[in-house]
Amino acid sequence: MAAKIIDGKTIAQQVRSEVAQKVQARIAAGLRAPGLAVVLVGSNPASQIYVASKRKACEEVGFVSRSYDLPETTSEAELLELIDALNADNTIDGILVQLPLPAGIDNVKVLERIHPDKDVDGFHPYNVGRLCQRAPRLRPCTPRGIVTLLERYNIDTFGLNAVVIGASNIVGRPMSMELLLAGCTTTVTHRFTKNLRHHVENADLLIVAVGKPGFIPGDWIKEGAIVIDVGINRLENGKVVGDVVFEDAAKHASYITPVPGGVGPMTVATLIENTLQACVEYHDPQDE
């Protein structure tokens, strides 16, 4: 079996085009463009690349993008003060604080300071709790982007045995909630899981997010499985690869995401969707 490639780059561009059309319609109707504030503390090179891609995407769809590049020496109190000001700014619909933050700043305290209606990353405990209770509002971007990919490829997830490898707050845990909503029987594996191979071999839908190149051998993949590889790993030779051995896995899977060009573009596209949602549902003047 040769797997069909799930083209995240193309789907992400479709999503961004749809958002851009809605923004144009808003402006034509006399409404303001959505606003996203992107906050970067320090000069982590990887973070700078991610932030640049998010700002570029904002501008492409017609959002108002506000950048806050703060020095490494910024204190937690100064960062919280900025978030308070952005929470109170009626022209800002989304606040994104790029992680990781420098030592000495409490990630949890910072993320919880963002108002849930402006939490376009979907990391605030309120938004995660809404997802757990089957009443989602703003959803974590990577898991939601994966669901969008499955939907756009008309993949029926109801009744599938889904296995998530990795239990991070950003991907694994919220992904398990999205899969339950999508009708899957869901297993989450992690560093303490025994006999990982057994779980992988029984997965109809496999989502891998551990950040280790080639962590899952291709011959573990069940025939006809759907494989979603969230890993983005740069090797010493400069090549970017996922957590799954792609060439071998593609011989067994029915669908598979490539790295790069699979899940990655969907994370930014979903951030853009979330910002529009925050603007329309929570910040537009509501009809009485």
Swiss-Prot record:
Q: Which family does it belong to?
A: Belongs to the tetrahydrofolate dehydrogenase/cyclohydrolase family.
SUPFAM superfamilies, per database record: Aminoacid dehydrogenase-like, N-terminal domain, NAD(P)-binding Rossmann-fold domains
Sorted UniProt keywords: Amino-acid biosynthesis, Histidine biosynthesis, Hydrolase, Methionine biosynthesis, Multifunctional enzyme, NADP, One-carbon metabolism, Oxidoreductase, Purine biosynthesis
Subunit composition and interactions: Homodimer.
- From the UniProt record, give the pathway where this protein acts: One-carbon metabolism; tetrahydrofolate interconversion
Q: What is this protein called?
A: Bifunctional protein FolD
A Pfam family (short name) is THF_DHG_CYH_C
Q: Which InterPro entries match?
A: Aminoacid_DH-like_N_sf, NAD(P)-bd_dom_sf, THF_DH/CycHdrlase, THF_DH/CycHdrlase_cat_dom, THF_DH/CycHdrlase_CS, THF_DH/CycHdrlase_NAD-bd_dom
